[in-house]
């Protein structure tokens, strides 16, 4: 982290006001840093399993009452995966900087500190029970949870994220000022009482900020460590969805990949794209009960499908036709991964309803041109014209118009493209040899 004293920090602010701002977003340093973070995380978790016991099985197991009880694993002391260095050179369990399953001092404290933050936020759910009575668009107690989370977040970050570089001490307050926006916006909207792919994107950005400034080192953390962080995040957000009946944010309904998530499928598909000698389930068997039961605790993709089974009933091909199509027409996990990445570019990073709530600071995710490093134009609209956060009767955080396959723009199934049209698995997350300008340079 050289020249940290020259970094300018600022509270992130809105820059995407309507769909016409999307082209500028795709020219921004922020956009390339998001893609870079996604790319390096994918490479890290390829071929890796989650250690058993990290994911809370009750959250994806159907019961008469879909709300997980408050005495499940989320409220126990941290249950970190034990060292598992089975084979020398195993990137899932052994760090690059050592031939032992150990983390550097900074990574050990910050890895555990990050899990402690998620554990505290889980306890806040226990302390904030849902209000009694029917609620059509989410339970208002969720706003109390958000208020508590926002009030405590600054202290949570400072208490659990440790600096091991003295030159960065003077910059830490500014760093936290930018960073905390992204974690605070990772758990849904307190106003709209919804959760969706934009909030999932915000958590990726939060992790990217820690990686960027070496507060999490991918050279020392293992693939299983990274998966554990995301697994704990996903368990927390699914508890929020279940306990507070959160609406899907900007969902395409049955014509979308999933009501709430996209990245979880990318990471899970990457887990099935690693060591060629490792036994993995065939793509077209992934929806079968034996495969779901076997892999739902160790693979994020399968775990996400298990969650769908918990919250939805009826024929799978009717309520989740996109996922059903993947497992009816694709035979290779490499094609599943590349297709999901292309879909992410279009349906998440390319959609205004999703990225309008992604804000930009001065250093972590700047609104500056990737090629020239100059500020991108800002076309700010009047507040009374673009106030998307007003608490009206919106359907799924959008306009209230019923979504059908005829009135939304859809991404063609990328896994069904001709071979000549396909790119390599990570083409959508590489920069043709360029690296994003990081805020500390």
Swiss-Prot record:
GO molecular function: peptidyl-prolyl cis-trans isomerase activity; protein tyrosine phosphatase activator activity
SUPFAM superfamilies referenced in this protein's UniProt entry, alphabetically: PTPA-like
Nucleus keyword on record: yes
Location within or outside the cell: Cytoplasm; Nucleus
The keyword Iron-sulfur appears for this protein: no
InterPro entries the record matches: Phstyr_phstse_ac (IPR004327), PTPA_C_lid (IPR043170), PTPA_sf (IPR037218)
Enzyme nomenclature, EC number: 5.2.1.8
GO-annotated cellular components: chromatin; cytoplasm; nucleus; protein phosphatase type 2A complex
GO biological process, one term: DNA repair
UniProt enzyme class: isomerase
Annotated keywords: Cytoplasm, Isomerase, Nucleus, Rotamase
Family: Belongs to the PTPA-type PPIase family.
Protein name (record): Serine/threonine-protein phosphatase 2A activator 1
Naturally occurring in which organism (per UniProt): Debaryomyces hansenii (strain ATCC 36239 / CBS 767 / BCRC 21394 / JCM 1990 / NBRC 0083 / IGC 2968) (Yeast)
Taxonomic placement: Eukaryota, Fungi, Dikarya, Ascomycota, Saccharomycotina
Gene name of the encoded protein: RRD1
């Amino acid at each position: 982290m050289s020249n940290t004293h020259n970094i300018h920090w600022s509270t992130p602010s809105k820059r995407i006001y309507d769909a016409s701002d999307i082209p500028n977003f795709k020219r921004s340093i922020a956009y390339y840093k998001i893609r870079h973070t996604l790319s390096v995380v994918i490479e890290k978790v390829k071929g890796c399993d989650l250690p058993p016991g990290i994911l809370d099985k009750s959250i994806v197991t159907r019961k008469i009452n879909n709300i997980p009880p408050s005495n499940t694993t989320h409220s126990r002391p941290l249950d970190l995966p034990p060292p598992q260095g089975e084979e020398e050179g195993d990137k899932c369990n052994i760090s690059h900087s050592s031939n032992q399953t150990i983390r550097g001092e900074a990574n050990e404290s910050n890895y555990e500190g990050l899990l402690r933050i998620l554990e505290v936020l889980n306890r806040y759910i226990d302390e904030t029970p849902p209000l009694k009575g029917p609620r059509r668009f989410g339970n208002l107690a969720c706003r109390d949870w958000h208020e508590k989370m926002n009030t405590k977040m600054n202290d949570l970050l400072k208490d659990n994220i440790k600096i091991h570089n003295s030159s960065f001490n003077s910059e830490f307050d500014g760093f936290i000022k930018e960073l905390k926006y992204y974690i605070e916006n990772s758990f849904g909207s307190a106003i709209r009482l919804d959760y969706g792919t934009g909030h999932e994107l915000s958590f990726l950005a939060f992790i990217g900020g820690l990686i960027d400034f070496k507060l999490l080192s991918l050279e020392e953390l293992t693939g299983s460590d990274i998966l554990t962080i995301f697994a704990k995040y996903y368990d927390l957000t699914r508890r929020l969805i279940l306990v507070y009946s959160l609406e899907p944010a900007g969902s395409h309904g049955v014509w979308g990949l999933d009501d709430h998530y996209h990245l979880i499928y990318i990471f899970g598909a990457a887990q099935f794209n690693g060591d060629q000698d490792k036994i993995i389930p065939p793509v077209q068997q992934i929806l079968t009960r034996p495969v779901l039961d076997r892999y739902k605790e160790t693979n994020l993709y399968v775990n996400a499908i298990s969650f769908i089974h918990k919250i939805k009933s009826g024929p799978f091909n009717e309520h989740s036709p996109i996922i059903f199509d993947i497992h009816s027409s694709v035979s290779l996990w490499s094609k599943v991964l590349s297709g999901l990445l292309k879909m992410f570019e279009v349906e998440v990073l390319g959609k205004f309803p999703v990225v309008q709530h992604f804000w930009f600071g001065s250093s972590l995710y700047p609104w500056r041109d990737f090629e020239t490093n100059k500020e991108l134009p800002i076309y700010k609209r009047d507040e009374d014209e673009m106030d998307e956060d007003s608490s009206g009767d919106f359907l799924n955080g959008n306009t209230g118009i019923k979504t059908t396959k005829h009135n939304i723009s859809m991404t063609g199934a990328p896994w069904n493209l001709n071979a000549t049209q396909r790119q390599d698995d990570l083409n959508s997350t590489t920069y043709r040899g360029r690296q994003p300008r990081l805020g500390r340079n």
